[in-house]
């Protein structure tokens, strides 16, 4: 779950933010939650952590940036790969060009480094 409307939570009331997250969950049924923009207020985190496992990332591909070349997107990710890293790629029209180039090459690099992709445990 990543909210329904991808709003910046720090600019929303707690109640409205929780409603948005729950609305998304009614559609996708996930016990995981990652806040948009990796930002969440302490009150939102406390409320959501009672119902969801909050997951943050530590490697941002920036694949959504149209000013970023696909090669630079790949470099943004591969220079930060390490055991336990959580990498963010986006599934959107805006990010498609960079993600299509960088994701398979990132997976190849992960294999070459002897790292493994794992499911986040609940």
Regions found by a protein language model. Give the residues of each.
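C-terminal domain-boundary segment and adjacent tail
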Residues: 97-122
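Metal-dependent polysaccharide deacetylase catalytic core of the NodB/CE4 family, i.e.
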Residues: 1-72, 77, 81-94
């Amino acid at each position: 779950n990543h909210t329904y409307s991808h709003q910046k939570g720090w600019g929303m009331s707690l109640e409205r933010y929780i409603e948005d997250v729950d609305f998304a969950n009614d559609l996708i049924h996930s016990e995981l939650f990652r806040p948009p923009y990796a930002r969440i207020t302490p009150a939102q985190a406390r409320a959501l952590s009672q119902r969801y496992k909050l997951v943050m990332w530590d490697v941002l591909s920036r694949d959504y940036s149209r000013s970023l070349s696909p090669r630079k997107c790949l470099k943004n990710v591969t220079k930060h790969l390490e055991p336990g890293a959580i990498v963010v790629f986006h599934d959107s029209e805006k990010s498609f060009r960079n993600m299509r180039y960088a994701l398979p090459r990132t997976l190849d690099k992960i294999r070459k480094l002897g790292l493994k992709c794992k499911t986040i445990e609940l």
